[in-house]
Amino acid sequence: MGFKANIGIIGAMDDEVREIISHLEDKSVETVSGIDFHTGKLFGKNVVIARCGVGKVFAAICAEAMIIKYSPDLIVNTGVGGAVDKVLRPLDIVFADKLVQHDMDTSAIGDPVGLISGINRVYFETDARAREILVDAAKTLSVNYYVGTVATGDKFISSVADKNRISSTFGAIACEMEGGAIAHTAFVNGTSFIVGRAISDSADGDASMDYPTFLPIAANISTDLTLALIEKY
């Protein structure tokens, strides 16, 4: 029998998973579908961690391979994202209560914007228990956090027009490029999931300047929260 994971961790970039991987005990690595999956133990639990790459297709490939190969009870998508709600500032944390794919649009044939055909859903709800643990961890670490809708799409949002469209159409407070695809994949497989994002940029005209400045710090905050979730879940 292969490695059965209690928790699976997915991040898009090395900065988002490197530190978590370094904490693994009894670690090993296996390549599936072109993605390196790092397995081991954290806080006595079987954990699998992967860097999926940027964008929805890479994220979905990674989540599907992880579920089929390691059967995690919970998938955690950790990393950084852009602020959609103007109240958010760099290094704030957003815990998604639901995910939406903002670039999914078949409204020309009468569907609601964001509808995923075949399963007839616009939003995917995250695991309530995992969300509560993350909120408690944020309070303990004195991190400024928000809970709300996170929007996913295959575009780095860096214009006020895109930001306003995502906010008004979906009620999203943050945006990124993987969470909605991981949520979609987890949903069709019956796997629980949670998505957390540390804000690295303002998703507007300043985004390209904010992002490299705040990325390393934001990724470290996400790592601390993810480790707390693994310990308590």
Set out the residue ranges of the language-model regions.
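N-terminal short beta-loop-beta anion/metal-coordinating cradle
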Residues: 2-64, 70
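Generic non-transmembrane alpha-helical segments
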Residues: 23, 129-144, 185, 221-232
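Alpha-helix C-terminal capping segments
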Residues: 65-69, 87-88, 184-192
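Proline-aspartate-enriched helix->loop->beta-strand connector
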Residues: 71-76
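Mid-sequence, gly/pro-rich, charge-dense loop/helix-turn segments that line enzyme active sites
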Residues: 84-170
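A C-terminal functional module that forms or caps the active site or interfaces directly
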Residues: 156-201
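His/Asp/Glu-rich mid-to-C-terminal helical/loop segments that flank catalytic regions of hydrolases
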Residues: 203-233
